[in-house]
């Protein structure tokens, strides 16, 4: 007796109207994560994972490419509105927001969530170049 082939069910992508874009812009890299309102990650992309290595990773253009890749990945969820949370002092802060805006998302809110110590840990020593 032949077995009937088991068909895998297609996973239905849930439709989400608005989400949150978390941008972590350090001096060396930029990480873009798009989540739903509860914080469940829908897609993420980095400047390093987008093909940039070394010092090119820390450029505004690399951050822009990472944002475009992340935006392309969440299009299937039907995302329309984005709230943007920016963390860090890196060069990719502004270009990432511009890229998300150009990708067709309506940016409702931009918040800077860079952690500021209330005189916490001792900072690293100053660079001598």
UniProtKB/Swiss-Prot annotation:
Gene designation per UniProt: rpsK
Superkingdom of source: Bacteria
One function term, GO molecular function aspect: structural constituent of ribosome
UniProt similarity note: Belongs to the universal ribosomal protein uS11 family.
Gene Ontology cellular component annotations, sorted alphabetically: ribonucleoprotein complex; ribosome
UniProt-listed PANTHER family: 40S RIBOSOMAL PROTEIN S14/30S RIBOSOMAL PROTEIN S11
PROSITE patterns membership: RIBOSOMAL_S11
Transmembrane segments: none
Name of this chain's protein: Small ribosomal subunit protein uS11
Keywords: Ribonucleoprotein, Ribosomal protein, RNA-binding, rRNA-binding
SUPFAM superfamilies to which the protein is assigned, alphabetical: Translational machinery components
Protein role: Located on the platform of the 30S subunit, it bridges several disparate RNA helices of the 16S rRNA. Forms part of the Shine-Dalgarno cleft in the 70S ribosome.
Subunit structure: Part of the 30S ribosomal subunit. Interacts with proteins S7 and S18. Binds to IF-3.
Lineage of source species: Bacteria, Pseudomonadati, Pseudomonadota, Gammaproteobacteria, Pasteurellales
Family annotation (InterPro entries): Ribosomal_uS11, Ribosomal_uS11_bac-type, Ribosomal_uS11_CS, Ribosomal_uS11_sf
An annotated GO BP: translation
